[in-house]
A protein has these predicted regions:
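Targeting/processing segments of secretory and organellar proteins
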Residues: 6-8
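Residues at or immediately preceding the N-termini of alpha-helices
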Residues: 53, 132-133
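A charged, well-structured terminal subsegment
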Residues: 133-153
Length: 153
């Protein structure tokens, strides 16, 4: 009987701890693509973190290496946060885009995502636009080599 009481107490304490200190569940990241002539837009929704950065990495690298898309634009309007592993995935995508002579651009960066890229001195490395229209109408440089748009975004 004493063991049952201890087990109940332990279970109760564990549940209380989990309720107080658990990380809130966030919606999963979603990725989809759209096509405008030779331009592929990758729509990303949700945070890009250590837990899901392999998903965006797989999607982007598949488009660049396997499908050889000439122009890839990543829609980040619905990405509130990017951690260091997400940044690493974007940097790898940029490198692969350059290797395969594809254009790689970002648009719609949240303030948080933009700050991360600024702090890491990567904002000027990427081709960055504020809107989809700007990204679609921009000259078609290869893989972020034209830095003129990154300063205005």
């Amino acid at each position: 009987m004493h063991a049952d009481r201890a087990t109940e107490s332990l279970a109760s304490s564990r549940k209380l701890w989990q309720n107080r200190f658990s990380v809130p569940q966030r919606p999963p990241m979603k990725i989809s693509t759209r096509q405008f002539a030779s331009i592929t837009i990758l729509d990303v929704t949700g945070e890009i973190t250590l837990l899901n950065s392999p998903e965006i990495r797989k999607a982007v690298l598949g488009l660049l290496r396997e499908k050889r898309v000439p122009h890839l634009i990543v829609n980040m309007l619905d990405v509130p946060y990017v951690d260091s592993s997400g940044v690493a995935s974007l940097v790898e995508a940029l490198k692969v885009a350059r290797d395969v002579n594809s254009r790689f651009a970002l648009y719609g960066l949240s303030k948080s995502a933009k700050n991360v890229l600024e702090l890491t001195h990567l904002l000027r490395v990427f081709e960055v636009h504020q809107t989809e229209q700007e990204a679609l109408e921009a000259p078609q440089p290869l893989a972020g080599r034209d830095k003129s748009n990154s300063e205005s975004a």
